[in-house]
Protein backbone atom coordinates (compact mmCIF):
# COMPACT_ATOMS: atom_id res chain seq x y z
CA UNK A 1 0.00 0.00 0.00
CA UNK A 2 1.49 3.32 -1.08
CA UNK A 3 0.40 6.83 -0.11
CA UNK A 4 0.97 9.99 -2.11
CA UNK A 5 1.19 13.22 -0.14
CA UNK A 6 1.43 15.71 -2.96
CA UNK A 7 1.85 18.80 -0.83
CA UNK A 8 0.06 22.04 -1.60
CA UNK A 9 -1.14 21.86 -5.20
CA UNK A 10 0.22 24.37 -7.65
CA UNK A 11 -1.27 25.03 -11.05
CA UNK A 12 1.77 24.10 -13.10
CA UNK A 13 2.47 21.53 -15.79
CA UNK A 14 4.84 19.45 -13.66
CA UNK A 15 2.35 18.75 -10.87
CA UNK A 16 -0.50 18.28 -13.33
CA UNK A 17 1.52 15.61 -15.14
CA UNK A 18 2.36 13.93 -11.82
CA UNK A 19 -1.28 13.76 -10.70
CA UNK A 20 -2.44 12.52 -14.10
CA UNK A 21 0.15 9.72 -14.03
CA UNK A 22 -0.85 8.70 -10.50
CA UNK A 23 -4.55 8.62 -11.37
CA UNK A 24 -3.94 6.68 -14.58
CA UNK A 25 -1.58 4.06 -13.19
CA UNK A 26 -1.94 3.80 -9.43
CA UNK A 27 -4.33 1.43 -7.67
CA UNK A 28 -3.55 3.08 -4.34
CA UNK A 29 -5.48 5.61 -2.33
CA UNK A 30 -4.36 9.20 -2.84
CA UNK A 31 -4.23 11.91 -0.16
CA UNK A 32 -3.89 15.54 -1.23
CA UNK A 33 -3.34 18.73 0.76
CA UNK A 34 -4.88 21.69 -1.02
CA UNK A 35 -4.83 25.45 -0.52
CA UNK A 36 -8.43 26.18 -1.46
CA UNK A 37 -11.54 24.56 -2.88
CA UNK A 38 -11.08 26.12 -6.33
CA UNK A 39 -8.06 23.84 -6.83
CA UNK A 40 -10.53 20.96 -7.20
CA UNK A 41 -10.95 22.09 -10.82
CA UNK A 42 -7.31 21.11 -11.34
CA UNK A 43 -7.96 17.61 -9.96
CA UNK A 44 -11.06 17.13 -12.12
CA UNK A 45 -9.09 18.03 -15.25
CA UNK A 46 -6.69 15.20 -14.40
CA UNK A 47 -9.49 12.72 -13.66
CA UNK A 48 -11.12 13.60 -16.98
CA UNK A 49 -7.92 12.86 -18.89
CA UNK A 50 -7.54 9.61 -16.91
CA UNK A 51 -11.15 8.74 -17.94
CA UNK A 52 -12.34 8.54 -14.34
CA UNK A 53 -15.99 9.32 -13.64
CA UNK A 54 -16.25 11.26 -10.39
CA UNK A 55 -18.73 11.02 -7.54
CA UNK A 56 -17.61 13.81 -5.22
CA UNK A 57 -18.58 14.39 -1.60
CA UNK A 58 -17.62 17.88 -0.37
CA UNK A 59 -17.63 18.72 3.34
CA UNK A 60 -18.03 22.51 3.58
CA UNK A 61 -20.06 24.99 5.62
CA UNK A 62 -21.38 27.14 2.75
CA UNK A 63 -23.46 25.89 -0.16
CA UNK A 64 -23.38 29.40 -1.64
CA UNK A 65 -19.58 29.45 -1.68
CA UNK A 66 -19.33 25.94 -3.14
CA UNK A 67 -21.90 26.72 -5.85
CA UNK A 68 -20.00 29.85 -6.85
CA UNK A 69 -16.68 28.00 -7.06
CA UNK A 70 -18.11 25.03 -8.99
CA UNK A 71 -19.87 27.34 -11.47
CA UNK A 72 -16.42 28.56 -12.54
CA UNK A 73 -15.04 25.08 -13.26
CA UNK A 74 -14.35 24.39 -16.92
CA UNK A 75 -16.93 22.43 -18.90
CA UNK A 76 -14.26 19.83 -19.66
CA UNK A 77 -13.67 19.30 -15.94
CA UNK A 78 -17.36 18.58 -15.36
CA UNK A 79 -17.93 16.21 -18.30
CA UNK A 80 -17.39 13.04 -16.29
CA UNK A 81 -18.84 14.19 -12.97
CA UNK A 82 -21.64 11.88 -11.88
CA UNK A 83 -22.44 13.76 -8.69
CA UNK A 84 -21.35 16.52 -6.34
CA UNK A 85 -22.81 16.09 -2.86
CA UNK A 86 -22.19 18.99 -0.47
CA UNK A 87 -22.59 18.30 3.25
CA UNK A 88 -22.21 20.05 6.63
CA UNK A 89 -23.56 23.28 5.12
CA UNK A 90 -25.12 25.91 7.38
CA UNK A 91 -28.44 27.56 6.53
CA UNK A 92 -27.32 31.18 7.01
CA UNK A 93 -24.35 30.62 4.67
CA UNK A 94 -26.37 28.81 2.01
CA UNK A 95 -29.69 30.63 1.65
CA UNK A 96 -29.00 31.99 -1.84
CA UNK A 97 -27.92 28.68 -3.35
CA UNK A 98 -29.47 25.34 -4.20
CA UNK A 99 -28.12 21.98 -5.27
CA UNK A 100 -28.87 21.01 -8.90
CA UNK A 101 -31.62 18.40 -9.14
CA UNK A 102 -29.34 15.84 -10.77
CA UNK A 103 -27.06 15.72 -7.72
CA UNK A 104 -27.66 13.68 -4.56
CA UNK A 105 -26.29 12.86 -1.10
CA UNK A 106 -26.17 16.37 0.41
CA UNK A 107 -26.84 16.94 4.11
CA UNK A 108 -27.16 20.10 6.20
CA UNK A 109 -25.03 20.50 9.31
CA UNK A 110 -28.07 20.09 11.57
CA UNK A 111 -28.80 16.61 10.22
CA UNK A 112 -25.21 15.50 10.92
CA UNK A 113 -24.75 16.74 14.48
CA UNK A 114 -24.53 13.74 16.81
CA UNK A 115 -25.18 11.40 13.87
CA UNK A 116 -22.18 11.83 11.60
CA UNK A 117 -22.66 8.18 10.53
CA UNK A 118 -25.28 9.57 8.13
CA UNK A 119 -22.35 10.28 5.81
CA UNK A 120 -21.01 6.72 5.86
CA UNK A 121 -22.97 5.57 2.79
CA UNK A 122 -22.31 8.73 0.70
CA UNK A 123 -18.59 8.50 1.48
CA UNK A 124 -18.53 4.77 0.71
CA UNK A 125 -20.08 5.50 -2.69
CA UNK A 126 -17.84 8.46 -3.54
CA UNK A 127 -14.45 8.19 -5.18
CA UNK A 128 -13.42 11.75 -4.24
CA UNK A 129 -13.86 13.20 -0.75
CA UNK A 130 -13.08 16.89 -0.25
CA UNK A 131 -12.95 17.96 3.41
CA UNK A 132 -12.70 21.74 3.85
CA UNK A 133 -11.57 23.25 7.15
CA UNK A 134 -14.51 25.67 6.96
CA UNK A 135 -16.73 22.81 8.18
CA UNK A 136 -15.00 22.74 11.59
CA UNK A 137 -16.04 24.57 14.75
CA UNK A 138 -13.73 27.52 15.46
CA UNK A 139 -12.73 26.03 18.80
CA UNK A 140 -11.14 23.08 16.98
CA UNK A 141 -9.37 25.12 14.28
CA UNK A 142 -8.41 28.27 16.20
CA UNK A 143 -5.92 29.34 13.54
CA UNK A 144 -8.61 29.73 10.88
CA UNK A 145 -8.73 33.36 9.77
CA UNK A 146 -12.44 33.27 8.88
CA UNK A 147 -14.44 32.75 12.06
CA UNK A 148 -17.40 30.35 12.20
CA UNK A 149 -18.57 29.40 15.68
CA UNK A 150 -20.72 26.47 14.51
CA UNK A 151 -19.55 23.38 12.70
CA UNK A 152 -18.35 19.83 13.05
CA UNK A 153 -16.16 18.84 15.98
CA UNK A 154 -12.66 17.52 15.39
CA UNK A 155 -13.94 14.08 16.41
CA UNK A 156 -16.64 14.18 13.73
CA UNK A 157 -14.10 15.42 11.18
CA UNK A 158 -11.88 12.47 12.13
CA UNK A 159 -14.76 10.03 11.60
CA UNK A 160 -15.12 11.38 8.07
CA UNK A 161 -11.39 10.89 7.47
CA UNK A 162 -11.45 7.32 8.77
CA UNK A 163 -14.51 6.49 6.69
CA UNK A 164 -12.72 7.72 3.56
CA UNK A 165 -9.71 5.56 4.40
CA UNK A 166 -11.78 2.50 5.28
CA UNK A 167 -14.06 2.59 2.23
CA UNK A 168 -13.47 2.66 -1.51
CA UNK A 169 -12.81 6.40 -1.80
CA UNK A 170 -9.81 6.76 -4.12
CA UNK A 171 -8.92 10.42 -3.57
CA UNK A 172 -9.16 12.26 -0.25
CA UNK A 173 -8.47 15.99 -0.24
CA UNK A 174 -7.96 18.18 2.83
CA UNK A 175 -8.52 21.73 1.64
CA UNK A 176 -8.96 25.32 2.83
CA UNK A 177 -5.42 25.45 4.22
CA UNK A 178 -4.92 28.94 2.79
CA UNK A 179 -7.30 30.19 5.50
CA UNK A 180 -5.38 28.67 8.42
CA UNK A 181 -2.58 30.27 10.40
CA UNK A 182 -0.45 27.65 12.11
CA UNK A 183 -1.06 27.26 15.83
CA UNK A 184 -0.98 24.33 18.22
CA UNK A 185 -4.69 23.45 18.15
CA UNK A 186 -5.06 23.82 14.38
CA UNK A 187 -1.95 21.77 13.67
CA UNK A 188 -3.19 19.02 15.99
CA UNK A 189 -6.64 18.97 14.33
CA UNK A 190 -5.21 18.72 10.81
CA UNK A 191 -2.67 16.08 11.87
CA UNK A 192 -5.48 14.03 13.43
CA UNK A 193 -7.43 14.10 10.17
CA UNK A 194 -4.45 12.64 8.32
CA UNK A 195 -3.83 10.08 11.09
CA UNK A 196 -7.41 8.78 11.05
CA UNK A 197 -7.41 8.57 7.26
CA UNK A 198 -4.30 6.38 7.36
CA UNK A 199 -5.78 4.39 10.25
CA UNK A 200 -8.86 3.70 8.13
CA UNK A 201 -6.76 2.45 5.23
CA UNK A 202 -4.71 0.17 7.49
CA UNK A 203 -7.83 -1.15 9.24
CA UNK A 204 -9.45 -1.97 5.91
CA UNK A 205 -6.37 -3.88 4.74
CA UNK A 206 -6.40 -5.92 7.95
CA UNK A 207 -10.09 -6.85 8.02
CA UNK A 208 -10.84 -7.22 4.30
CA UNK A 209 -12.11 -10.62 3.26
CA UNK A 210 -13.74 -11.83 0.08
CA UNK A 211 -17.37 -10.62 0.15
CA UNK A 212 -19.99 -13.26 0.89
CA UNK A 213 -23.10 -11.85 -0.77
CA UNK A 214 -26.70 -12.91 -0.32
CA UNK A 215 -29.02 -11.69 -3.09
CA UNK A 216 -32.53 -10.30 -2.53
CA UNK A 217 -34.47 -9.54 -5.72
CA UNK A 218 -37.52 -7.28 -5.73
CA UNK A 219 -39.83 -7.68 -8.71
CA UNK A 220 -41.78 -4.66 -9.96
CA UNK A 221 -39.73 -2.12 -8.07
CA UNK A 222 -40.98 1.01 -9.82
CA UNK A 223 -39.87 2.48 -12.11
CA UNK A 224 -37.79 -0.66 -12.81
CA UNK A 225 -39.01 -4.18 -13.56
CA UNK A 226 -36.80 -5.58 -10.84
CA UNK A 227 -33.93 -4.54 -8.58
CA UNK A 228 -31.40 -6.81 -6.91
CA UNK A 229 -30.09 -6.01 -3.44
CA UNK A 230 -27.08 -7.72 -1.91
CA UNK A 231 -26.10 -8.14 1.72
CA UNK A 232 -22.48 -8.90 2.58
CA UNK A 233 -22.77 -11.45 5.37
CA UNK A 234 -19.25 -10.64 6.56
CA UNK A 235 -20.04 -7.08 7.61
CA UNK A 236 -23.82 -6.63 7.12
CA UNK A 237 -23.31 -4.00 4.43
CA UNK A 238 -26.03 -3.60 1.81
CA UNK A 239 -25.78 -2.78 -1.90
CA UNK A 240 -28.33 -2.08 -4.61
CA UNK A 241 -27.37 -3.18 -8.11
CA UNK A 242 -28.04 -0.83 -11.00
CA UNK A 243 -30.36 -2.91 -13.22
CA UNK A 244 -28.31 -2.91 -16.45
CA UNK A 245 -24.64 -3.59 -17.01
CA UNK A 246 -22.65 -0.36 -17.00
CA UNK A 247 -19.75 0.45 -19.35
CA UNK A 248 -16.23 0.07 -18.01
CA UNK A 249 -15.75 3.72 -17.07
CA UNK A 250 -18.85 3.52 -14.85
CA UNK A 251 -18.37 0.01 -13.46
CA UNK A 252 -17.58 1.32 -9.96
CA UNK A 253 -21.20 2.49 -9.73
CA UNK A 254 -22.77 -0.87 -10.61
CA UNK A 255 -23.37 -1.68 -6.94
CA UNK A 256 -24.51 1.26 -4.84
CA UNK A 257 -23.83 1.15 -1.08
CA UNK A 258 -27.10 1.53 0.79
CA UNK A 259 -28.84 0.55 4.01
CA UNK A 260 -31.33 -2.10 5.02
CA UNK A 261 -33.90 0.70 5.18
CA UNK A 262 -33.47 1.25 1.42
CA UNK A 263 -34.24 -2.43 0.83
CA UNK A 264 -37.23 -2.38 3.18
CA UNK A 265 -38.68 0.73 1.49
CA UNK A 266 -38.09 -0.66 -2.00
CA UNK A 267 -39.67 -4.02 -1.13
CA UNK A 268 -43.03 -2.22 -1.05
CA UNK A 269 -42.83 -1.72 -4.82
CA UNK A 270 -41.08 1.61 -5.31
CA UNK A 271 -37.34 2.34 -5.21
CA UNK A 272 -36.24 4.34 -2.17
CA UNK A 273 -35.80 8.11 -2.74
CA UNK A 274 -32.00 8.10 -2.26
CA UNK A 275 -31.48 5.19 -4.66
CA UNK A 276 -33.90 6.78 -7.13
CA UNK A 277 -31.78 9.95 -7.17
CA UNK A 278 -28.61 7.94 -7.72
CA UNK A 279 -30.07 5.72 -10.45
CA UNK A 280 -31.46 8.81 -12.22
CA UNK A 281 -27.98 10.33 -12.26
CA UNK A 282 -26.52 7.12 -13.68
CA UNK A 283 -29.34 6.96 -16.25
CA UNK A 284 -28.37 10.44 -17.45
CA UNK A 285 -24.77 9.36 -18.04
CA UNK A 286 -25.69 6.11 -19.77
CA UNK A 287 -28.52 7.40 -22.00
Regions found by a protein language model. Give the residues of each.
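Conserved alpha-helical scaffold segments that buttress catalytic/binding sites
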Residues: 1-287
Amino acid sequence: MNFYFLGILKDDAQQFTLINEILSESKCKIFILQKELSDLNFILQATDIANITSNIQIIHNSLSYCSDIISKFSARSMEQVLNIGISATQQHLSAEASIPNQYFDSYRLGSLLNQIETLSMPIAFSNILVADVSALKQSDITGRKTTYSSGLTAQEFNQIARSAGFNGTQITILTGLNDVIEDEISTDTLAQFIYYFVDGVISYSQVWVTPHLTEFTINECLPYEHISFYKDDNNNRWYAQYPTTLPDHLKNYQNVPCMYEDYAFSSKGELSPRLMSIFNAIDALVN
